[in-house]
C-alpha cells in the first residue's frame, strides 16, 4: 500500500528494487501495489520515469493470459526479464523495461494479476481511501496465502493511527 502521506520516490524505488532483484523470483517481492487515488497519477508517473512499462488494456489482456496457464503460474515467466515476458505475450516494450505493470481492479482469484507472479510483473490497484486499500490488501493476502505479507509506505511521524490499524 502506498498511502498519500508516503514519500513517493522512496516507495517506488523500494518496490522497483524488490521486483528487479533476481527478476522478482523472491516470494517476498511485491506482487501488487495498492495506491490511494489522491496520489495514483504521481505514483504512476514515478514508476514510468524509472523504466517501468504500463500495459494498455489490450496488452494487459495478453500478459494476463501469459501469467496463468491452465490454472497455474506459467513457469516460462518465472525469473525472466520484463522484455522476455512481454515478448512471450506478444507485447512490444521499450528496451530496458524493468517491470510490466497491469492496472487492474479485481482482487479476486479470477484476476491473473492478483496471483503471485515470481517475475517483474506487477498489478497496480487504485484505492479510494485507506480503508479500501486495507480491504484490497487483506483480500489479496487471504487468496494468496497467509504465509505472505503486506507492507505500507506512509509518513510514520504523521500517520501512527493508520500504521496501528494496518498492523
Where does each model-flagged region fall?
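Conserved C-terminal structural/oligomerization subdomain of aldehyde/semialdehyde dehydrogenase
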Residues: 91-167
Amino acid at each position: 500500500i502506498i498511502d498519500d502521506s508516503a514519500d513517493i520516490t522512496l516507495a517506488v524505488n523500494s518496490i522497483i528494487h524488490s521486483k528487479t532483484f533476481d527478476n522478482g523470483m523472491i516470494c517476498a517481492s511485491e506482487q501488487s501495489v495498492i495506491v490511494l487515488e489522491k496520489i495514483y497519477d504521481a505514483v504512476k508517473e514515478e514508476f514510468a520515469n524509472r523504466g517501468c512499462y504500463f500495459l494498455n488494456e489490450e496488452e494487459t489482456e495478453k500478459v494476463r493470459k501469459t501469467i496463468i496457464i491452465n490454472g497455474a503460474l506459467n513457469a516460462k515467466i518465472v525469473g525472466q526479464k520484463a522484455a522476455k515476458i512481454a515478448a512471450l505475450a506478444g507485447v512490444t516494450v521499450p528496451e530496458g523495461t524493468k517491470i510490466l505493470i497491469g492496472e487492474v481492479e479485481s482482487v479476486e482469484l479470477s484476476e491473473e494479476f492478483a496471483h503471485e507472479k515470481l517475475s517483474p510483473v506487477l498489478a497496480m490497484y487504485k484505492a479510494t481511501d485507506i480503508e479500501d486499500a486495507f480491504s484490497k490488501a487483506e483480500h489479496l493476502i487471504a487468496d494468496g496465502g497467509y504465509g505472505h505479507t503486506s507492507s505500507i509506505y506512509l509518513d510514520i511521524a504523521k500517520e501512527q493511527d493508520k500504521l496501528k490499524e494496518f498492523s
